[in-house]
């Protein structure tokens, strides 16, 4: 990032507010927003309902890894019917808990640049809500924003951060939005113009982000002990993720669901088998067994391993299997 031309980070009232700013500044009704098939439901509320975009999806996975070719194909398809698009890249992904490798990140950049070369103007949003929560060495260990900053005149990269998960600061509602335009002109002037538009949106929407929690985040970042404390919490999450993987490697679940690859973040997903509807299973699991999960599609169940003690993981999945069996017959 040292050699990149970047704008100044602008404080937002956490990451969701940053998404709302992006939508208000860059999305008109009917504009395409490109997402993987597994995406956070708030994107639909923010971009789909509020900004009335057209959501275009592609399969997230290909052969157990990120589907960079699928992204590239989708961008070319979108470019045939639109001159611009918003592309959202969310790693670690919510709901699946997947982060691509560095090799896949380079392929993502190539796909975006190829579409830009073909004439598609893109606003690429790097949603880094869960950044840093990586549990395998082969995960991309940096924001994909660095791959996309200044990559092409037709690409505007935007980095969104939030203290909530990155700094374990729930309820603070503090985040940042950063721009990196492409091209050979005066990028500082471009960034300044974008920053003024962004500050106008903030002023006209919420007036300002809360100063008290901003000050708390600054103190946290300056605290010499903060890095060790954050590592301690990440290690706890890593242990819970590893325990989840151990439990799910048991063949007893193979008739009920397949496990989507996961290596980071707060969550993981399973794809149900046997014709069991995910929402019906979610309600049944809650009503009969008192366990809460999320149905992210008609076939997919999201489990938050982040909130489970290691000793609870097996019980939760055993109970999920029991609930699935109730419905599968």
What is the meaning of each model-derived region?
Residues 1-120, 124, 131-151, 311, ...:
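Conserved core of the PLP fold type I
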Residues 12, 58-60, 160, 294, ...:
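Hydrophobic residues at beta-strand termini and immediately following loops
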Residues 58-62, 91, 162, 211, ...:
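Active-site donor-binding loop signature of nucleotide-sugar glycosyltransferases
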Residues 76, 109, 153, 280-329:
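PLP-dependent enzyme catalytic core of the Aspartate aminotransferase-like
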Residues 86, 121-123, 158, 267, ...:
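Structural preference for beta-strand elements that scaffold enzyme active sites
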Residues 148-235, 283:
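Conserved core segment of the aminotransferase class I/II
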Residues 178, 269-271, 304-306:
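Short hydrophobic/aromatic beta-strand micro-patches
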Residues 211-214, 218, 230-245, 256-271, ...:
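Conserved glycine-rich beta-strand-loop-beta hairpin in the small C-terminal domain of fold type I
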């Amino acid at each position: 990032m040292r050699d990149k031309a970047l704008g100044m980070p602008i404080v937002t009232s956490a990451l969701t507010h940053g998404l709302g700013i992006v939508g208000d500044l860059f999305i008109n009704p009917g504009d395409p927003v490109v997402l993987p098939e597994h995406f956070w439901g708030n994107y639909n509320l923010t971009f789909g309902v509020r900004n009335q975009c057209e959501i275009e999806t592609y399969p997230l996975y290909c052969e157990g890894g990120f589907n960079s070719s699928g992204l590239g194909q989708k961008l070319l398809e979108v470019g045939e019917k639109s001159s611009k698009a918003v592309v959202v890249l969310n790693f670690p992904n919510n709901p699946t808990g997947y982060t691509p490798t560095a090799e896949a990140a380079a392929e993502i950049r190539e796909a975006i640049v190829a579409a830009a070369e073909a004439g598609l103007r893109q606003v690429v949003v790097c949603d880094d809500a869960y950044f840093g929560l990586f549990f395998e060495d082969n995960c991309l260990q940096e924001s994909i924003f660095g791959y996309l900053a200044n990559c092409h005149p037709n690409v505007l990269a935007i980095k969104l951060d939030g203290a909530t998960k990155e700094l374990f600061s729930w309820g603070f509602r503090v985040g940042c939005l950063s721009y990196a335009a492409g091209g050979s002109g005066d990028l500082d002037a471009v960034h300044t113009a974008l920053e003024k538009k962004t500050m106008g949106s903030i002023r006209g929407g919420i007036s300002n982000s809360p100063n008290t929690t901003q000050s708390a985040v600054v103190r946290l970042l300056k605290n010499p002990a903060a890095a060790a404390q954050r590592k301690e919490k990440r290690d706890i999450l890593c242990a819970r993720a590893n325990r989840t993987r151990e439990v799910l490697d048991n063949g007893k679940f193979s008739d009920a669901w397949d496990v989507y690859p996961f290596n980071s973040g707060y969550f993981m997903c399973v794809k149900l088998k046997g014709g069991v509807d995910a929402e019906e299973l979610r309600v049944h699991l809650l009503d009969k067994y008192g366990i809460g999960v999320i149905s992210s599609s008609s076939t997919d169940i999201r489990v938050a391993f982040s909130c489970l003690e290691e000793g609870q993981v097996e019980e939760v999945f055993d109970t999920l299997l029991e609930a699935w069996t109730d419905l599968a017959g």
